[in-house]
Amino acid sequence: MAQVIVGARNRLNRALDPVTSGMAAVSARREYRWTLIALVAIAALVFPRFQSQSYQIDAAVEAETFVLLALGLNIVIGYAGLLDLGYAAFFAIGALTMAWLGSPHFAISAHSFSSPFVSYGPQGIFVNFYLMIPIAAIAAAFCGVLFGAPTLRLRGDYLAIVTLGFGEIVPRVMQNLGPGNALGWPDITGGVNALSGIESPPTLNFASVHADFVGGASRAPWYYLGLIMIAFSIVVIMSLRESKLGRAWAAIREDEVAAAHMGINITRTRLLAFGLGAAFSGFAGVLEAARLGSVFYTTFSFNVSITILVMVILGGMGSIPGVILGAIIMSYLNILWLGDISAKINEVGGNFENGPSIIGSFGHWMHNVDLASATPLLFGLILLFTMLLRPQGLWPSTTRARELAPATGEILEEENEELWTDRS
């Protein structure tokens, strides 16, 4: 009898070994994940204290703007599987909404009136910056649904072409609705002169925090404002991903026909993807317009849409940390690193410029290299090599990593571990 009990216990232990090892692996991965998140959060918080130049903080704030944009596009492409090549249009709509309601452009003659959130006077309508954030997000979301409606029956390349058209139409319309426009309408957008005089966020004073966005010597308040907006966006997007809507997005991304047979409302699900993705673009537009104090419509070109797309693909579609990583890399590459690399190449080329014929010619070429002017080419090459060498991205979600990785024993082991953990 004792031998039977011992044998049964041994068989039970062998059966439970995969379970216990899987749970131990999950526990280790979660501990590593939270440690990494804590280290990144600490590094982000202390970053401005180690930057002596204001342009470095400005570069970080611009990178934060693109992080917001990439997070929004990730909803459309990474979660719902809808290719949107006109995403910069919603960026423009958010910035334009901020410019309309936060600059002297809409001057009125009504008597002066003030409230904690809105002030009316001869200089225009000025809505409090913090109230403008949800207003611009709602405006961009409405336009996202409006532009998404005609694409409901389109798939793949056809969807991409139509969204590309919308992305080109919006900035062109804004440029042509300025003073003296062909329609005879009043100046709505400022035209080629754009809109300027946009108000910055009001100074914050609470507890030991003093954030002056205008008169302060430091650009750090802008950086921390962007950090707060990113943190809020991540929380909202993670909640959406784990919700019923997020599962519906995953279903239509994998097989729209099967999703429809399971009772998922395809029209509603797709429109919500376009609308919510556009909302985060409008979110970023408010930050950009307030930081620069003006809106130039040439900023919202097709190149911007492609840049954001490259960020999402490089980092890993469907992966929040991957998208953030891709946005930071591409932003700094565009803002700082290409210029620094060009300067080093120019310096080396200057040393060989007066050499023998071939060396001198090559040195002259190096001395005049400007990588910043070849940004579209470089970004295209990055996109090409990413798709060829690492299609899942630098930091993919576990789901996409399994889809695109070869079926090796290592991958199968990760799949077994995934049974006991959440999606990243």
Where are these regions (language model features)?
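Transmembrane alpha-helices and adjacent helix-loop boundaries
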Residues: A2-S424
